[in-house]
Structures are given as structure tokens and as C-alpha cells.
């Protein structure tokens, strides 16, 4: 299957506008497109988060603009979240210390840190797809879901660019 990956560093690059339009100048306007919103959870985005990425909170308006544009073109929206068990048994070795000695860890489903940051809200037709490693494709059913939806192009937006956005782009 042909896949084209448009990487959006911190969701900003695709939102370049021209004088005639408030919308992105991208030529991608087909209906076989999905936006993958990656790791926009409190622990990564909110300044009080355990692994906050500097500047990530400022990308929320740009991501919302990208999503609105995509929805106007009937693009799919897939929310990729990093999910870990409270025990930390499923985390990468360098992050195990965040789960020991009574610590609650990060990106645990059902916790504040694991929730999407304020300002981003999935709609009922959106897909929620948890991941357990950097890439949204590694050991998940994301590829199967995208194929079944007829998606041939993915637009990546989110945080943790050196790890999760890039890992997802590499595996796409």
C-alpha cells in the first residue's frame, strides 16, 4: 500500500498560510487522509505533567486548526495516546523509576496525566488508539484500522517529536 507521511513538527509546519486563505496551503485534500494526533496528554503537554515537553501546550491551537481543516475535507482523526499500567511493568527501562517507590507513573489511563490536555476534544466518530511504545504502529492495530478505513495518507501532529512522532513516521 502506498503511504505518504507528512510530518508536522509540533503541528506547526502544515499550518503555514498564504494571504488569500486562513487554511493550510497543502495540496493534500483527498478523502483518504487521516490525522494522527500523537501524545497530546497532560503528562507530556501540561507544564505540571511528569514529562512535559517545553512549548507543547502552545501547539494546542495549531492542532485544533489542523483538525478543523481536516474535518472540513472529511479526513479521519485518530487520537494516539501513550498508555501504561500503574505497576510500570510495560514501560521502557529508563522510565521505570517513575513507577517505583509509590510513584504513580505517567500516562496511566484514568489519571489526570493520561488524559488529553484541555483544549483538545475528540468527536464521537474519531478513533482512539492507545500505544505502548514510541511508534503508534508498533504492536498495535493502527495499521489494520487505517487500511480498513481506506487511508493512504497520514498527517502527523503532536508532541514528543524526537521519540513518538518520529517513530510513528518511520513505521508508517
Residue ranges: model-predicted function:
Residues 9-17:
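Hydrophobic h-region of N-terminal signal peptides that target proteins for export
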Residues 19-123:
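Active-site acidic carboxylates
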Residues 1-4:
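Positively charged n-region of N-terminal signal peptides that target proteins for export
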Residues 110-159:
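Internal catalytic-core helix/loop-beta-alpha segment
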Residues 9, 46-48, 88-89, 137-138, ...:
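Active-site-proximal flexible loops/turns
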Residues 172:
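Short conserved active-site loop signatures built around small residues
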Residues 161-168:
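Short glycine/serine/threonine-rich phosphate/pyrophosphate-binding segments
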Amino acid at each position: 500500500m502506498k503511504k505518504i507521511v507528512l510530518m508536522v513538527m509540533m503541528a506547526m509546519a502544515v499550518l503555514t498560510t498564504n494571504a488569500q486563505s486562513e487554511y493550510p496551503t497543502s495540496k493534500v485534500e483527498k478523502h483518504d487522509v487521516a490525522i494522527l494526533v500523537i501524545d497530546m496528554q497532560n503528562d507530556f503537554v501540561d507544564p505540571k505533567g511528569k514529562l512535559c515537553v517545553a512549548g507543547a501546550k502552545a501547539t494546542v491551537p495549531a492542532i485544533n486548526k489542523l483538525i478543523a481543516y481536516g474535518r472540513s475535507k472529511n479526513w479521519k482523526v485518530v487520537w494516539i495516546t501513550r498508555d501504561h499500567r500503574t505497576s510500570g511493568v510495560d514501560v521502557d527501562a529508563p522510565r521505570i523509576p517513575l513507577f517505583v517507590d509509590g510513584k504513580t507513573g505517567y500516562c496511566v489511563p484514568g489519571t489526570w496525566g493520561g488524559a488529553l490536555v484541555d483544549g483538545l476534544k475528540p468527536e464521537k466518530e474519531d478513533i482512539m488508539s492507545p500505544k505502548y511504545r514510541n511508534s503508534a504502529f508498533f504492536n498495535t492495530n493502527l495499521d489494520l484500522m487505517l487500511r480498513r478505513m481506506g487511508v493512504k495518507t497520514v498527517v502527523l501532529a503532536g508532541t514528543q517529536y524526537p521519540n513518538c512522532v518520529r517513530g510513528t513516521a518511520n513505521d508508517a
